[in-house]
Regions:
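Structural detector for internal amphipathic alpha-helices that build alpha-solenoid repeat scaffolds
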Residues: 20-34, 54-67, 78-82, 86-98, ...
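Alpha-solenoid helical repeat architecture
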Residues: 10-19, 45-50, 61, 76, ...
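Amphipathic alpha-helical scaffolding segments comprising HEAT/armadillo-like alpha-solenoid repeats
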Residues: 1-12, 34-46, 66-78, 100-112, ...
Length: 135
């Protein structure tokens, strides 16, 4: 399956029942798991359909090991800039499962960046994440 076909499998259509759609994206997720690099699944931008595929893309990312996610941590924390974005909570929950020692530097960098940009939503999400990971 090509990347375009995977993206197509993630697009929801009103003609699908929930079961049909879940079956369709499961096929895409299983194909996407074969990809070594995660960039194509981190908030991909495709004309007119970008955000509708973010949730399944987040599910692909959540299946990866901590080691596989390490190079992408900054981008994954950026996904938390708006917790209303599709897939944000999938990423949030996956990051919570990682050892804090792996996340600490990137998390602190993102907090500084959010403050610098006056991005209150992102900062709130990062503070909430910090509270939950330290429980």
């Amino acid at each position: 399956m090509t990347l375009d076909e995977i993206y197509e499998s993630f697009i929801w259509d009103a003609s699908y029942t929930n079961e049909e759609y879940e079956s369709k994206i499961t096929i895409g997720i299983n194909e996407a798991k074969k990809y070594k690099y995660l960039y194509p699944f981190i908030q991909p931008v495709i004309p007119e359909k970008s955000k509708c595929i973010w949730e399944p893309c987040a599910r692909v990312i959540a299946l990866k090991s901590d080691e596989e996610l390490k190079p992408y941590l900054y981008l994954l924390f950026e996904w938390l800039q708006d917790l209303n974005w599709p897939g944000a909570y999938v990423i949030f929950d996956r990051l919570l499962k990682m050892p804090f020692s792996l996340l600490e530097d990137v998390l602190n960098h993102c907090k500084r960046q959010a403050k610098k940009e006056n991005d209150e939503l992102w900062l709130m999400a990062l503070e909430d994440f910090s509270k939950q990971i330290n429980l």
